[in-house]
Amino acid sequence: MTRKYFGTDGIRGTVGQPPITPDFVLRLAHAVGRVLRRVESRPTVLIGKDTRISGYMLESALESGFNSAGVDVVLLGPLPTPGVAYLTRAQRASLGVVISASHNAYPDNGIKFFSAQGTKLSDEWELAVEAALEEPPVWVDSATLGKARRLDDAAGRYIEFCKSTFAHDLTLKGLKIVVDGAHGAAYHIAPKVFHELGAEVIAIGCAPDGLNINHEVGATHPEALITAVKANQADYGIALDGDADRLQMVDADGRLFNGDEVLFLMVSERLARGEKVPGTVGTLMTNMAVELALKSRGVEFVRAKVGDRYVLEELEKRGWLLGGEGSGHLLALDKHTTGDGLISALQVLQACVRSGKTIAQLLGDVVLFPQTLVNVRLKPGQDWKASEKLALETKAVEAELGDTGRLLIRASGTEPLLRVMVEARDARQAKACAERVADTVRS
């Protein structure tokens, strides 16, 4: 059954346009409340948000919808998505709700949910909510209405949780770190985490005004971080996105490290400590250099579909702990139930402090392969999968690339585009092969 409202990461859109309107969000919360009350007589839901101006409006709508269904609400205020996941589990709540559109600009917003265990919810649960949305509301009587209260120390509890994932025998003393909070949910949290572990912290992107979230700052705009690291002669730079589940890092030279490289470092740090890492999960877009480097160290590597929920599914299926995406969504399931930019950064810094090496030194000879991505607009009705010419060209390119390169062809989920990605040790070869395949699609 196809979902009508839920996407790969909750419900998202432009504020004021369906479904991100106050009336729909109220009905959504009421429907979720009814689903919760099928298994629990008096559920409690936690609600956190990022710093978008629309968060106030949507928070009020959610609160009203839940209360009208007989569900109690605990308001957390601005808090990173992984912080909501953690507190949902720690507070023994029935459900966690996040109001955020992650790395998008302020006109967008969204609603996503976490289970009582702090994990993403199943497709079946989302379908049950959508079915409840189609039914007329059933308002509870006045004596059964839910109540709302605030958890005043939500940020402090999450800060302590993040710090607890860093080795207790280590500190960040002597390090100067630039922290970019993307004017988002971690603006009042991220600087404190690193400062309380001993670092000298320079904060940028930590002055939200409701409209500037992700604007020319944060993980999707690392130029600001690179400039600040160089200007302040810092040792490291850490950039989060609007809801702080995504990470990009920079070293003292201004070199940017993406999620693929950070994943490799997280695995390597554990191997160096003598831990067993049977395997890790990346995505279809994970750089092949990382795959080869991990395999050379005896670590199995599996690719999931693009999206952190698919990485998580593969990890849980195989009983593994570490996975992630090049975009900076990283999972360490023995540290947290979901991707967490702050905890991922702490794992990298722990590796650097313990070894006395920089990120670049820890990566050693692992150099990402050049990637070429070409977007080809499809003609109306064009069935690229049935093209014999494309099948032959694909086979020829894959033969040319051999074991040190790869070709990935996938359709866009939102536009009539075919994405052709080629990865190879040689940038010119990658570009030439990608153009050959793209030209075949166009012909």
From Swiss-Prot:
Pfam families: PGM_PMM_I, PGM_PMM_II, PGM_PMM_III, PGM_PMM_IV. The keyword Magnesium applies. SUPFAM superfamilies: Phosphoglucomutase, C-terminal domain, Phosphoglucomutase, first 3 domains. It comes from the Bacteria. The active site is at 102 (phosphoserine intermediate). GO terms for molecular function: magnesium ion binding; phosphoglucosamine mutase activity; phosphomannomutase activity. Activated by phosphorylation. One of its GO terms (cellular component) is cytosol. Mg(2+) binds at residues 102, 241, 243, 245. HAMAP family: GlmM_B. Belongs to the phosphohexose mutase family. This is Phosphoglucosamine mutase.
